[in-house]
Amino acid sequence: MTERPKIRVLLIDNHPLVLDGLKAVLETFDHIEVAGTAGLAQTGLEIGRQILPQVVLMDINMPKLSGIDAIELFRNELPQARVVMLSMHDSREYISSSVMHGAAGYILKDVSTDEIVSAIETVAGGGTYFSSGVFDALMGERVEEGSDPLTPRERDILGLIVAGRSNKEIAETLGITSATAETHRKNLKKKLGITTTAGLIRYALDHGIVSKVG
């Protein structure tokens, strides 16, 4: 049996109890390596330059340099690192701001260990991840009647894209072929005038039309 490659993770949180607890839990998983920890975003950036993490799990509210402001610094200096925001806040303002700055994921602090691990695995594989509580918050605000140009099926596709699903996973969830899922993805971009998956995610957040499917 082939051993799973380790995912190098950097943890950043200004609460020592949270930081130590998260580190202890993640270290129980053989395929996750907590390569470094920091109590400040700036310190985390300095450590990141040395350890070159694949995933940065970072608190959103920190002194001196906030997690949101730090996202762009990580993207500029450590382009291989994927940033996941860890927060107590489920407001669209925080979520949208994080995505606009380049976060690959957003999870709430009350999620299970399994969900944190899923987030790490998903973003390390190039996807995006938003915890179930974040979906609930997004679903609480809908666009005005007639202002949404997407069909119900397109909204389902968009919701699955935001959840980081591959074309194969989208196909399995909706009972379509992978080729059809890819066509839907391309059509969404063309219809909305968006060229990247990140742009689709921003659109979904800004318009409050994310669907939780499956």
Curated annotation (Swiss-Prot):
Q: Which stretches hold the DNA-binding feature?
A: 167-186
For this protein, what is any one GO molecular function term?
Answer: DNA binding
- Subcellular locations according to the entry: Cytoplasm
Any idea where the Response regulatory domain is?
A: 8-124
Q: Does the keyword Transcription apply?
A: yes
Q: Name one GO biological process term.
A: phosphorelay signal transduction system
Q: Which Pfam families match?
A: GerE (PF00196), Response_reg (PF00072)
- Subcellular location, principal: cytoplasm
Which residues carry the post-translational modification 4-aspartylphosphate, per the record? D59
**GO CC term, one of those recorded:** cytoplasm
Give start and end of each HTH luxR-type domain. Answer: 143-208
Question: What keywords were assigned to this record?
Answer: Activator, Cytoplasm, DNA-binding, Phosphoprotein, Plasmid, Transcription, Transcription regulation, Two-component regulatory system
Listed PANTHER family: NITRATE_NITRITE RESPONSE REGULATOR PROTEIN NARP, TWO-COMPONENT RESPONSE REGULATOR
Function of the molecule: Member of the two-component regulatory system MctS/MctR, which activates mctP expression.
State the protein's name. Answer: Transcriptional regulatory protein MctR
Q: Which organism is it from?
A: Rhizobium johnstonii (strain DSM 114642 / LMG 32736 / 3841) (Rhizobium leguminosarum bv. viciae)
- Record gene name: mctR
